[in-house]
């Protein structure tokens, strides 16, 4: 169908997480690499997801502001899974109650996906323009194994799509070595969670690196 429209090319990509990341898409589609600290525009690219593209179209062509958002409600323990068009600002509780309420065996609700999502502490929190999914997890799915010591296997570095060394960033973060964290490009972390997923020692690498990244960015902008 894209052949009907000038300037549109549909390009199939491998099903590889996190291929949908901004810099990963540029590399896969244009074979260009955005340098550390750089922006897509530096290599002649602008990346927008489908929701943003639709919002721009609605604003320009229909004079419609961004007042609603598509939200997927899902999870193995959630019986009434659905895709809903929700007004921005709607309390999360309203969405969940509309679909029958929180299941008894749900232990945690995640805003976002299983890899990059964040736990919801308050169901009265509002739906934001970036709220794409509500994921319900059981106790078994949220169970964390005891944290061990880093064995320097390098699996986290092999899995990192940004070419970082999470095992090193973890060590620097635990010692509060902010300058070294910046020198090792902690600010380039896209928080995909691949390091956490692959770590055989069950070290909470994503949580540690996310906090360290925030501290470094505050200093840079400072």
What are these regions (language model features)?
Residues 7-10, 68-70, 103-112, 179-183, ...:
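Flexible, glycine/charged-enriched surface loops at secondary-structure junctions
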Residues 47-55, 68, 79, 87-90, ...:
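Conserved active-site and cofactor/substrate-binding residues in soluble primary-metabolism enzymes
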Residues 72, 83-85, 94, 110, ...:
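Structured core elements
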Residues 74-81, 138-141, 153:
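Short, flexible active-site loops
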Residues 131-147, 157, 161-222:
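Ferredoxin-type iron-sulfur electron-transfer modules in oxidoreductases and energy-metabolism complexes
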């Amino acid at each position: 169908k894209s052949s009907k429209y000038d300037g549109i090319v549909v390009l199939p990509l491998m099903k590889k997480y996190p291929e949908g990341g901004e810099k990963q898409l540029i590399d896969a589609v244009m074979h260009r690499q955005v340098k550390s600290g750089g922006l897509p525009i530096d290599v002649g690219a602008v990346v927008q997801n489908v929701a943003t593209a639709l919002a721009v179209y609605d604003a320009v062509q229909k004079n419609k502001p961004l007042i609603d958002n598509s939200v997927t409600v899902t999870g193995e323990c959630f019986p009434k899974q659905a895709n809903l068009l929700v007004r921005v600002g709607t309390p999360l509780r309203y969405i969940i109650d509309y679909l029958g309420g929180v299941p008894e065996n749900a232990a945690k609700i995640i805003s976002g996906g299983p890899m990059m999502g964040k736990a919801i502490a308050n169901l009265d929190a509002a739906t934001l323009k970036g709220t794409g999914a509500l994921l319900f997890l059981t106790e078994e799915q949220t169970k964390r194994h005891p944290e061990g010591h880093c064995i320097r296997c390098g699996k986290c570095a092999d899995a990192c799509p940004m070419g970082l060394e999470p095992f090193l960033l973890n060590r620097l973060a635990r010692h509060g070595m902010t300058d070294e964290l910046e020198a090792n490009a902690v600010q380039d972390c896209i928080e995909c969670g691949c390091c956490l997923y692959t770590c055989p020692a069950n070290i909470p690498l994503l949580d540690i690196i996310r906090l360290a990244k925030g501290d470094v960015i505050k200093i840079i902008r400072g």
